[in-house]
Amino acid sequence: MNKTKILILCVCVLAAIFLSFMLLPAVSVAEGESEERLYVENGDVNALLDSINSKESIKCDFTLSMAIRLTSVFRTFKPGSYVLEDGMSTMRLVNKLVKGRQDPIKLTFNSVRTKEQLCSRLSQQLMLDSADIANVLRNDSILKAYGMDTLSVMSIFLPDTYEVYWNIKPNKLMDKFHSAYKAFWTADRKNKAEAAKITPFQATVLASIVDEESTYKPELPVIAGLYLNRLHIGMKLQADPTVKFATGDFSLRRITLEHINATRNNPYNTYTHIGLPPGVIRIPEKATIDAV
């Protein structure tokens, strides 16, 4: 047997051995868990290996490390959030990352009062930077496509659990929230708001005040009714939560005359301004909107 044939045979044997190792499990999650989640921010191989090495459940041995480095010569790894099942082989893991077969995350938020808080909550769960989200919320030309402006946009967000991709773009994220908003405002809900002589936006603003007043569900319709009556007769709402919002100090437990006077020119102060504030003072719960 000549040297060339011997070399080819050795290469084939080594390839077969490497392939057999590629088929072995690379993921072994903790007892009681069924999966591990891996976040990939970019296609950089070293950054990817660092992420993998940080996961105790992933066995980053020579086979996996070599497979990733060899694959990176010909293919790129797609950013995203990937669920790795217990017992997943090296080959399946690498293929999933190369083909970008990412898995959606569950995005949630509640008890949000300001745009800054919302941007922070969302960015903590997504690849997006809070500034990227803030830029959309402050751009009237972008918001116009959703029938919103910088004052009304916070009413588009509804506390819920949303399935989105971790590396979702700002415009796609807004599309997701807008779709949920449109689905929520059914004909029945719109008719109810119309019967109360308010718009869906006004109902949401009023609900944000009611949400600040109480968390006890049986009280919500009563509080909403009280404010609706004041609204319809042209009386100032005199809602303490609006003054708290105007001060920007959400730790306040009691609103005094000093707080009211200090914010008297603020349009959110319903002690000094007739009607509803120009926007929500928090993102209200769906149940509170339904109570209006």
For the regions a language model picked out, list residue spans one by one:
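N-terminal type II signal-anchor transmembrane helix
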Residues: 1-35
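Basic side chains
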Residues: 3-5, 88, 121, 212-213, ...
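Signal peptide-directed extracytoplasmic domains
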Residues: 21, 27-185
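Bacterial extracytoplasmic/cell-wall-associated proteins, especially those involved in peptidoglycan
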Residues: 127-131, 142-292
